[in-house]
Amino acid sequence: MIARLVGFLVEKNSDSAVIDVNGVGYLVQLSGRALDYFSEIEGEITVHIETQIREDSITLFGFASYLERDWFRLLTSVQGVGGKAALAILTALTCDAISVAISSGDKTMICRANGIGPKIAQRIINELKEKPAAIALFSSAKGDHLAVEDISQPAASAHHAGNFMADAVSALLNLGFKPAEAQRVVQLASEELGDQATLDSLVRLALRLSSKH
């Protein structure tokens, strides 16, 4: 079972990429967010992998963080939600937004994902809302009934800024940064971006700042 790939992104499509690891190219299915994230990195990348084995195929699904991978596992545990549907949800919504949608029972939010209708969205909510593994991922987002547009906008409160910073530090740690360095450059990025900070912008600016020191 492949759990992680460390290599170079050498080819990308709308929903997948080829990762070159020591001369061997692995075709990996990715969410739009993960694909955008990896495309911004020059050099070696670390892709967390979930391997799905079927009778006639082996498919590698890749993620930029453990959190994204864990949500993929939870989503695909729901009856009728396959790997592509789970990636569609992870493309349309951040992990924080998925937490809010499920904990608040907002199926309209989940329906923003391509191919996800009200029936499947409601099933996701019903099956995951009280599931211990899902509750553990809700964190402080549980009970926060923010509107859909609030999730897609830059962080407007210390609560969400803190979540973005923690996720950004985690992303840098996955890329091989030492904890102190990851904390330092994310803090610098947060101070520079202010209220306009999002997870993507924090990680990208932190990577640029780290290359200057």
Swiss-Prot record:
Domain notes: Has three domains with a flexible linker between the domains II and III and assumes an 'L' shape. Domain III is highly mobile and contacts RuvB.
Cell location: Cytoplasm
Subunit architecture: Homotetramer. Forms an RuvA(8)-RuvB(12)-Holliday junction (HJ) complex. HJ DNA is sandwiched between 2 RuvA tetramers; dsDNA enters through RuvA and exits via RuvB. An RuvB hexamer assembles on each DNA strand where it exits the tetramer. Each RuvB hexamer is contacted by two RuvA subunits (via domain III) on 2 adjacent RuvB subunits; this complex drives branch migration. In the full resolvosome a probable DNA-RuvA(4)-RuvB(12)-RuvC(2) complex forms which resolves the HJ.
Keywords associated with the record: Cytoplasm, DNA damage, DNA recombination, DNA repair, DNA-binding
Upper lineage: Bacteria, Pseudomonadati, Pseudomonadota, Alphaproteobacteria, Sphingomonadales
Principal subcellular localisation of the protein: cytoplasm
Positions of the UniProt region annotated as Domain III: 160-213
Single GO MF descriptor: four-way junction DNA binding
Function: The RuvA-RuvB-RuvC complex processes Holliday junction (HJ) DNA during genetic recombination and DNA repair, while the RuvA-RuvB complex plays an important role in the rescue of blocked DNA replication forks via replication fork reversal (RFR). RuvA specifically binds to HJ cruciform DNA, conferring on it an open structure. The RuvB hexamer acts as an ATP-dependent pump, pulling dsDNA into and through the RuvAB complex. HJ branch migration allows RuvC to scan DNA until it finds its consensus sequence, where it cleaves and resolves the cruciform DNA.
Region (Domain II): 65-143
UniProt xrefs under InterPro entries: DNA_helicase_Holl-junc_RuvA_I, Hlx-hairpin-Hlx_DNA-bd_motif, NA-bd_OB-fold, RuvA, RuvA_2-like, RuvA_C, RuvA_C_sf
An annotated GO BP: DNA repair
Region span, Flexible linker: 144-159
Region Domain I, annotated ranges: 1-64
Descriptive protein name: Holliday junction branch migration complex subunit RuvA
Stated family: Belongs to the RuvA family.
CC per GO annotation: cytoplasm; Holliday junction helicase complex; Holliday junction resolvase complex
Taxonomic source organism: Zymomonas mobilis subsp. mobilis (strain ATCC 31821 / ZM4 / CP4)
